[in-house]
């Protein structure tokens, strides 16, 4: 028993007792079945940088297997301004290593980030993920260095203005 895995804050890592990089479709299905997960979310970035979400209510095992295997079709022309309507059939396929239990969902929900693929099953060359991957490889080839970056997450709390906690706008990036 590996204590690092058992004590991991990612509930899937603790339950499956393996690191995220080793998650398989069967692992995800087992976690969903044994933990009462009722919804699966596929999350993917659009051209505007916003994270889009597809929600799937899990009503049977065949459906779960189908969405985990084949992903879901999305309209690329509504996601990216450079994709023409005539060639806009894209698929979002889940990356199992990104699976996490959504702490904000009202019903038990498992979320995963997705990759874009074209109608022929090939990675979408112009997707943000693939473009970054190609840039990292080129950077490494030219410099011999490895490119590492982390995203900046921003959360917004939207509620009626009650004037209870007034703040002055400081116009600084630290705020």
Positions of PLM-derived features:
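ATP/Mg2+-dependent ligation/transfer catalytic cores
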Residues: 1-174
């Amino acid at each position: 028993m590996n204590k690092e895995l058992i004590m991991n804050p990612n509930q899937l890592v603790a339950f499956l007792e393996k690191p995220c990089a080793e998650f398989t479709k069967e692992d995800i299905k087992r976690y969903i079945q044994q933990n009462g997960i009722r919804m699966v979310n596929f999350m993917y970035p659009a051209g505007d940088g916003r994270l889009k979400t597809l929600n799937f209510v899990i009503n049977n095992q065949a459906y779960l297997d189908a969405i985990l295997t084949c992903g879901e079709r999305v309209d690329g022309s509504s996601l990216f301004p450079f994709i023409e309507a005539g060639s806009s059939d894209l698929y979002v396929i889940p990356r199992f290593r990104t699976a996490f239990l959504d702490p904000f969902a009202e019903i038990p929900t498992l979320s995963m980030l997705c990759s874009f693929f074209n109608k022929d099953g090939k990675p979408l060359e112009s997707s943000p993920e693939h473009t970054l991957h190609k840039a990292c490889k080129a950077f490494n080839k030219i410099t011999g260095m490895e490119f590492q970056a982390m995203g900046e997450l921003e959360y917004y709390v939207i509620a009626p203005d009650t004037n209870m906690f007034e703040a002055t706008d400081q116009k600084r990036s630290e705020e």
